[in-house]
Amino acid sequence: DLLLATFVAIGSAVRAQEVLTASDVGRILAQAASEAEGRGLPATIAVVDRVGNVLGVFQMTGANLADPGFAPLGVAPDPTLRTVTVFGNPRGPDTGLNGLAFVPDTLAAIAKAVTGAYLSSQGNAFSTRTASQIVQNHFNPGEERTPSGPLYGVQVSQLPCSDLSRRSSDGTVGPKRSPLGLSADPGGLPLYKNGLLVGGIGAVADGGYGLDVDIFNQIGRAHV
């Protein structure tokens, strides 16, 4: 029994050391950018570790350029800005971010990556698309007179205004707060290495950030 316990302890220690290296991050970003380029969707891509530290961000040429149509009255946006516009469910809660324009797309990509890392586990990979289905005011989304999703409202739990958020993203090693709260916008996934959860990846390419109010209309379509 002692020998078995020793082997288990050694194995656990070795497995616990699995982390994303600089080489891993570079390869992940390159593969994601290659996929986005192949789809004709310039994207901004972020990679974080298990506790929300940003390990890398890559902005492809032409990704999420500011849309003058969303500019406030009297404001001429810089056409070189890379931003997203935040939208939500008109029948759901106001997150305090709804309708904001010119939010840096890097923050959206990081929020998606953090969500993929935080909500996943060794046994369950939790994407932001999955989050979108279970955080809305009806489950399934769009089905009136049904209870809210099991994680209704969790997307605002990490915002600075949240009662659940006690510490901001300071100089510590983490856990770090997601810059836009937990994300319900498709495009965030966990990252595994040798079977261990080591972080998350997030991508944004459509200039929008919100949630899927109709989870059925995205089948067969790219939406990140």
Predicted regions: what they are:
Residues 1-11:
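Bacterial N-terminal signal peptides
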Residues 12-16:
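Sec/Tat signal peptide C-region and signal peptidase I cleavage site
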Residues 17-223:
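Flexible, solvent-exposed loop/hinge segments and secondary-structure transition points
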